[in-house]
């Protein structure tokens, strides 16, 4: 499938997607889209940057059939995912060849699973979720749409992560705990109690830093 990649930083997700393709994934990157005007009209790793996500029609003209939305902000992924679908493009599930996804797990459209990540038995992962390299989604976990699981995250069995929640590097959620919608869990935090929606927590054990308003 020919893809447009949303997010064109050569030192970020763009390069990661191109490496995944080079590693044998059945895709071809034909264009990038990015909000950074300085990149428009340039090439990144040999692939042209055609404009912002609002210019998705240009990617369609370039032959794109689907899109990978590689943005770190959950809300941005949600917004851009809507633009992509409105343009008639597919949002394929993209799984690195060296990731493990259990046969009984489910992944929503537009979700990315990076190298050495694990999505275990009975896990249900929503749409446009970013499961970064080395993240662990244990058995019967539920992850809401547009959530971000940074590298090294660990989700214990039967835990839940809400829509648009962001888990920083190496964050851990112990078994059967819930992280609410739009919550932020800081890098290295260990969640041993439920996290309310729109709340930021950090530390070991994780404690509320501030409610988000």
Language model feature labels by segment:
Residues 1-21:
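Glycine-rich adenosine-cofactor-binding loop
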Residues 24-43:
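NAD(P)-binding Rossmann-fold cofactor-contacting core
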Residues 94-202, 206-209:
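Structural signal for interior beta-strand "rungs" in well-ordered beta-sheet cores
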Residues 10-11, 72-75, 207:
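Short glycine-rich anion-binding loops that position phosphate/pyrophosphate groups of nucleotides
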Residues 37-100:
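Phosphate-bearing ligand-interacting subdomains
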């Amino acid at each position: 499938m020919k893809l447009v990649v949303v997010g064109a930083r050569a030192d970020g997700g763009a390069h990661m997607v191109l490496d995944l393709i080079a590693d044998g994934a059945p895709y071809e990157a034909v264009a990038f889209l990015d909000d950074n005007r300085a990149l428009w009209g340039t090439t990144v790793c040999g692939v042209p940057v055609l404009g912002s996500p609002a210019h998705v029609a240009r990617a369609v003209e370039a032959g794109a059939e689907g899109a990978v939305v590689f943005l770190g902000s959950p809300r941005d992924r949600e917004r851009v995912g809507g633009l992509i679908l409105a343009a008639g493009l597919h949002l394929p599930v993209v799984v690195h060849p060296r990731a493990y996804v259990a046969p009984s797990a489910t992944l929503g459209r537009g979700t990315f699973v990076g190298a050495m990540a694990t999505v275990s038995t009975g896990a249900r992962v929503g749409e446009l979720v970013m499961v970064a390299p080395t993240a662990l989604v244990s058995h019967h976990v539920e992850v809401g749409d547009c959530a971000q699981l940074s590298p090294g995250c660990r989700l214990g069995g039967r835990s839940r992560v809400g829509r648009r929640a962001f888990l920083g590097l190496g964050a851990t959620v112990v078994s059967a705990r819930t992280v609410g919608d739009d919550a932020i869990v800081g890098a290295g935090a260990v969640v041993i109690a439920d996290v309310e929606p729109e709340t930021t927590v950090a530390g070991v054990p994780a404690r509320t830093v501030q409610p988000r308003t």
